[in-house]
Every structure is written in structure tokens, then in C-alpha cells.
Amino acid sequence: MESFAAGLRSAVRRNPDIIGIGEIRDYETADAAVQAGNTGHFCIGTMHTKSPGETFARLLGLFPPEIRDSMAAATLSLVQFILVQVLVRTNDGGRQAVREYIVMTDELRNTLSGQSHATWGHYIDEIIRQEKRRIRDQVLTMYQNDRIEKSEAALFIPAGEFPR
């Protein structure tokens, strides 16, 4: 295949149960993913983002400004779950996956649909912050429980938030 987008369009014609998208990083792939979702296909895609809220901004930023609002509405109706994951080195020499996520409930969709899509990311990240489910919150707990070194924790916790 010449691109992720071409592969995605080809996959839709085969009527798969699940479509995996290695990485959504350009307009063509993002558009093909939304179109696949609009036709009822279950798609799982990856993006490099630091928070679930940033994912909306990054995805919508791939679309030209003249269609961004309509793609925001389509995306909001299609996205079910956003997960961000990092691997943290533990004191036993291993790594542990640490995740933050948002489940796109009908209530959350209704709230977001009444706002500008430019505010969605902040709103989502604020929910996660208030619930203390951010990656940095979990890493701090790991550090406080002596599961990771301070130097490892410092990779995920901003200096101003790191306990003395």
C-alpha cells in the first residue's frame, strides 16, 4: 500500500470486524479513519499525544480549517475511548505501563457538543486531573511507594509539582 489512508480505504471494502490503524498522523489517514467509522467499522488507531485531551486537538488539527468544525462533530460522535500510555522503569528493573484515559459517555458527548471544539481538550484533561487519574498522579504514587526512583518520576512530573 502506498499509504495508511490507501490501506484503510482498501480494508473497508473487505468489511472487517476491526480495523487497526498503525498511526494517524496526516489528513488523508484521519479522514479515512473517520469515514470508516461513519460506515460502521470499529477502528483502533494510534497517535503520539501526551494526554487524552491533546488527542482531539492533534486529530482535528490534521483537517483543513474549512472542514474542521464538521469533522469535529463527526469525530465526537465516533470516538468511544482515548487512552494514553507510558512505560515507567521500576526499581526491580522492569517497566510498568501507566495510563490515563477518558471514556466518551453520552453525557460527556452532550457537554462537549455545546462547546467549541477548541475547548474539548482542556475540558477532558481537567476531568482527568480532578479525578487524579493523570499519568503524573500515578507516577507520584509509584514514587511515594518506593516503586520507582526519583529520577524516573521526574521524567513525568513537572519540576514545580514534584514534592520536596
State each model region's role.
Residues 1-164:
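Short, flexible helix-loop junctions that flank or precede catalytic/ligand sites
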